């Protein structure tokens, strides 16, 4: 148990799972219903049913800043493309950026980005549940 959780300082209401899932991400235009940027690579770690920590080297994608150009009303969320854990192929989920930190030292990805999943459909929830289940037993 972590010190924050032991002292009652951890505000999370959902369990987090330590994973390392390579993903692609892009900024989405919710009004036009199309991508604003090309896809870039990242890795999801520390994932729960409502959010995750994304590791990436890209805080700026084609002129769009992941946090500064992040519309709180959900018009410009990130779209993450994840590998399917139940079948072949991939699936997408939308997320809002909550925070980010630049990580010092040698690491594949230089930024940690806090995400909250948004507008999760029933099929996305099933895929997310399957992903969490596959990593809770490993």
Region spans (language model):
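Structured alpha-helical
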Residues: 1-138
């Amino acid at each position: 148990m972590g010190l924050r959780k032991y002292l009652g300082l951890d505000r999370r209401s959902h369990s987090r799972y330590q994973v390392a899932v390579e993903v692609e991400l892009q900024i989405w235009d919710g009004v036009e219903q199309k991508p604003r940027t090309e896809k870039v690579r990242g890795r999801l770690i520390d994932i729960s049913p409502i959010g995750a920590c994304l590791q990436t080297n890209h805080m700026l994608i084609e002129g769009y800043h992941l946090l500064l150009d992040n519309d709180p009303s959900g018009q410009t969320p990130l779209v993450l493309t994840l590998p399917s854990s139940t079948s072949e192929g991939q699936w997408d989920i939308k997320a809002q950026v909550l925070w980010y930190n630049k990580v010092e030292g040698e690491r594949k990805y230089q930024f940690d980005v806090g995400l909250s999943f948004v507008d999760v459909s029933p099929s996305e929830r099933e895929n997310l549940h399957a992903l969490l289940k596959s990593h809770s037993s490993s």
